[in-house]
Amino acid sequence: MSGVLNDVRDYTEGYLQVLWQNRLYVYSTAAVLIGVWFTVNMLFKKKKMVHPVSPLASKSVKKQEPASEAKKVIYVSGVKVFYGSQTGTAKGFAKELAEDVIAQGIQCEVIDMKDFDPEDRLAEECTSKIICVFLVATYTDGQPTESAEWFCKWLEEASTDFRYGKTYLKGMRYAVFGLGNSVYVGHFNTVSKSIDKWLWMLSAARIMTRGEGDCNVVKSRHGSVQADFQVWKGKFLNRLQALAKGEKKACSGNCKKASCKNKKKHKEEAEDNHSLAEKNNSEEELMESSSDEESSSEDEKSHGSVIDMEDLGNVMNHMKKAKQRMEEDEEDSQRVKQNGERKSECEEERREMITPALRDSLTKQGYKLIGSHSGVKLRRWTKSMLRGRGGCYKHTFYGIESHRCMETTPSLACANKCVFCWRHHTNPVGTEWRWKMDPAEKIIQEAMENHRNMIRQFRGVPGVRPERFEEGLTVKHCALSLVGEPIMYPEINSFLKLLHQQNISSFLVTNAQFPEEIRSLVPVTQLYVSVDASTKDSLKKIDRPLFKDFWQRFLDSLRALGEKQQRTVYRLTLVKAWNVDELKAYADLIALGQPDFIEVKGVTYCGESSASSLTMANVPWHEEVIYFVQQLANLLPDYEIACEHEHSNCLLLANHKFKVDGEWWTWIDYERFQELIQQYEESGGTKNFSAMDYMAKTPSWAVFGAGERGFDPTDTRFQRKNKTKDISGC
């Protein structure tokens, strides 16, 4: 037995010794066999991936269709539209979008950001299969509106807070549309850009490119913010339909002949192009691309992403081509930008200032619009004086016949967005004239025709005095203070000359942001400058000017006013708790421009508006206005309170030069002014004249301290039984 075991052991040792001596050949054979097996396996796997579905398999799929239909997959369960609005535009867009989404058979909810707590509820949208839409406006200094302030604050902090993590909103799908004005350079649509960025940083998936609405019709891609939204809304609804059907992102058009036969391959190309964009573009530009590819690519990689050497070579080629295309596109864009500046300038100037939406809004407010940038409106005091119920404060201070005063403007655009704007910021804004321009002759002719037509509507109205009705058909005064900034109109001097040629006096109001235009202005009957605050900070807070150098422009405008020889006026609007505690600063500004008169008026409450935080609490009592003016007069040795109009909550400070032999001469001799301006024009501007040359005596009832308190005794005081607020202005 032991011998047999020895033989077996000897045989085994001999066999192993042979193998050891020939181990190199054994290893080589094994390596070849393994390589052949691996290659065959990979080839079989590749063929299986591209192999068409067999008829038998298709039959089995058809048999399973009823079961899949019974258990239908829901890709989009609904839409939530979040809005952050100040003037109501974003809110209106949100409601409009919701109606269109519901019309597609998809549930939709509109949510005001101020009523939504993102800390407790936003993460729920990651698993709800709901599409979140954010319609947000950019407010003062690039800040969010009051309603969106907390939402933005929380989202910004969460995007950089390690406790939330970078995947806090992973699974959430969203789209963003911003409302802004490109006139505010450096702050255009910053809120929408920030929200888009913060959501992306928390791994939320963008379903489409961020939309930007521009209130500046000159720069708006489609002519108005409403048109911008309509275009974006159409794209969103199409994208929503595709998502609801479970479709992936459509072909980008970069593939050959735009046919995506090999979807996987083209998606890889899109990812490669996207990665190149990430490397070459800034983070802000990255925000512009859709993140759909990112989410879909992750799904594909989870199924296995084995790439052989041939595919890797193709990918590298695609990356090189994509980089070349990007460089070429960048060069083309630079050439277009350089060569198209003059062309775009011309095209922008041809755009009309009044958009269809603005036209509808102003028409509802009672404006009679003229051409593409002008308007006329019947003043409240015009109607009052036609009935013999008293005139406006200009009648008390300067002798204007209110029923013969046409209130108009050749420019509905303004360079400020004042918090107390009695038009609730419905007018456009701008820092220079970039719109289509109508001739001055057309504006004046149509303004007078519209004014007369509005006067004619009072024929036969109870209480209207026949003699005043006939007088009202002939315009004697023109108040260029309706809305906007009339001095922006490039042909303002021609406009004023045409008024004077028709014996119409001119009262022009400017917001003190155009000093050069003030200097080059031809003589007017009376030139006003609005002085709404006395310090840089308070002026920025109240007027919200567009110019970055607004304070220097403001001071230069006051200096330019001081160079005028005709009648000049500072107009101060008192807003309680905003600008009533700056007496010394006001006195310094008055010394700078040395106006002939200073009007001090309590702010008029124009009703509740989302565009302003002012309430009735900000309206000073008349006694408070009197006290302010008395305190201001104590700081001004050359001025004294001359007139009062209690109904308008307004007082007039006048320079002592208009007090002759103890009596005030604040009224205007309008016939004498027309003679002087005619002589000035005939002499080519050499025969100048001053405010003292056409002053007239102020009646006793208009003087401060009189029992009438500024009410003309020839009229009858009328007290409304139903005291509704009038927002028609002065």
From Swiss-Prot:
Entry keyword Mitochondrion: no
Chain ranges of the Radical SAM core domain: 398-642
Domain Flavodoxin-like positions: 79-237
Reactions performed catalytically: N(1)-methylguanosine(37) in tRNA(Phe) + pyruvate + S-adenosyl-L-methionine = 4-demethylwyosine(37) in tRNA(Phe) + 5'-deoxyadenosine + L-methionine + CO2 + H2O
Compositional bias segments (type: Acidic residues): 283-297
Residues the record lists as binding FMN: 85-89, 176-208
GO molecular function: 4 iron, 4 sulfur cluster binding; FMN binding; metal ion binding; tRNA-4-demethylwyosine synthase activity
Matching InterPro entries: Aldolase_TIM (IPR013785), Flavdoxin-like (IPR001094), Flavodoxin/NO_synth (IPR008254), Flavoprotein-like_sf (IPR029039), rSAM (IPR007197), tRNA_wybutosine-synth (IPR013917), tRNA_wybutosine-synthase (IPR034556)
Cofactor: [4Fe-4S] cluster
Assigned EC number: 4.1.3.44
UniProt-listed PANTHER family: S-ADENOSYL-L-METHIONINE-DEPENDENT TRNA 4-DEMETHYLWYOSINE SYNTHASE, S-ADENOSYL-L-METHIONINE-DEPENDENT TRNA 4-DEMETHYLWYOSINE SYNTHASE TYW1-RELATED
Family: Belongs to the TYW1 family.
Protein name per its UniProtKB record: S-adenosyl-L-methionine-dependent tRNA 4-demethylwyosine synthase TYW1
Organism expressing this protein natively: Danio rerio
Lineage: Eukaryota, Metazoa, Chordata, Craniata, Vertebrata
Recorded name of the encoding gene: tyw1
